[in-house]
């Protein structure tokens, strides 16, 4: 004899867009400006200006499930990811091929003091990081994280 068990299964469906749009090669950019200070305090949320150019032949969408956003990774001195999923910074509007955009990146600093590499990257949400499609498309800068001055 067996016991009948009832449970609910849920699923979410997200429309990502038309196949042609999803296949568009948006994964090309040029970092034009924005450099963090060489030292930051641990466990902080900081803002930093950045400028990027869309060097692809497709428009970067600023909205929708597969929007393009700027982000970052924190790496250790050996280049291994310590924090891979950095905060996203939304584009203020769609960026046409050849267009540039200036925005404020929001960056959460690591909790643990030490020497890190801050790697700036971009991603197309739900699909891919630019660095996964175009290795070498990131900018890496050394940053020392000092102990927090919180009491």
Regions from the PLM with identified roles:
Residues 106-114:
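Short, surface-exposed loop/turn segments at beta-strand-coil junctions that are enriched for proline
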Residues 50, 116-127:
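Internal, hydrophobic beta-strand segments that form the core of beta-sheet-rich folds
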Residues 1-6, 60-62, 126-138:
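Beta-sandwich strand segments
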Residues 30-31, 73-91:
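Short beta-strand and strand-turn-strand segments in soluble, beta-rich domains
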Residues 62-69:
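Short coil-to-beta strand junction motifs in C2/discoidin
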Residues 10-41:
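Low-complexity, acidic Ser/Thr/Pro/Gly-rich terminal tails and inter-domain linkers that flank the onset
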Residues 90-101:
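Short proline/glycine- and polar residue-rich coil/turn motifs
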Residues 52-56:
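Asparagine-centered strand-capping/turn motif at beta-strand->loop junctions
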């Amino acid at each position: 004899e067996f016991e009948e068990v009832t449970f609910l299964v849920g699923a979410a469906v997200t429309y990502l867009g038309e196949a042609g749009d999803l296949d568009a090669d948006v994964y090309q950019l040029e970092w034009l400006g924005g450099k963090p200070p060489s030292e930051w305090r641990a466990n902080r949320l900081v803002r930093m200006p950045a400028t990027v150019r869309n060097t692809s032949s497709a428009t970067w969408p600023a909205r929708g499930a597969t929007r393009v956003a700027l982000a970052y990774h924190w790496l250790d001195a050996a280049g291994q990811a310590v924090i891979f999923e950095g905060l996203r910074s939304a584009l203020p509007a769609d960026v046409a091929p050849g267009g540039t955009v200036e925005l404020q990146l929001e960056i959460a600093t690591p909790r643990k003091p030490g020497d890190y590499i801050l790697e700036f990257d971009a991603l197309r949400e739900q699909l891919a990081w630019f660095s996964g499609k175009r290795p070498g498309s990131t900018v890496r800068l050394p940053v020392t994280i000092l102990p927090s001055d919180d009491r």
